């Protein structure tokens, strides 16, 4: 289980991603890379399930242990990224922290554990950004 479920050619990229929706006190945890926001998660490795990948990715990125709940939605997205045709499949799960103190809400964005360029922070949950079923 060492290789990411990620396939590339000179002109294309295809990947399987898993991410978690963590809501606490009316806020959702997001990651920010420059001006782009996403839900924390990452590539699934070949031979692991999307749930196993999410638990592993959350630990790598945040240092927190999570319990994975129900699958909220799936996404298939095709677009051009860095001049390549990108085809992503993603699974989004409801999650909760095993230990509530693992990710404090200081009002500041903090660097991710495995990539300091990407920061984590809590944003207010608003009707326009988070579906009702979350």
Tell what function each PLM region has:
Residues 23-64:
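Conserved Nudix-box catalytic region and its N-terminal flanking loop in Nudix hydrolases
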Residues 79-106:
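Active-site-adjacent beta-strand/loop module that shapes the phosphate/pyrophosphate-binding cleft
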Residues 38, 75-80:
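Short, solvent-exposed loop/turn segments at secondary-structure junctions
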Residues 15-19, 88-92, 117:
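Short hydrophobic/aromatic beta-strand or adjacent loop that forms the aromatic wall/cage
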Residues 33-37, 102-104, 108-134:
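Nudix hydrolase/Nudix homology domain
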Residues 65-74:
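A short coil-to-beta-strand element that immediately follows conserved catalytic motifs
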Residues 1-19:
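Acidic, metal-coordinating catalytic segment for phosphate/diphosphate chemistry
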Residues 22, 92-96, 121-124:
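Short, well-ordered beta-strand micro-motif
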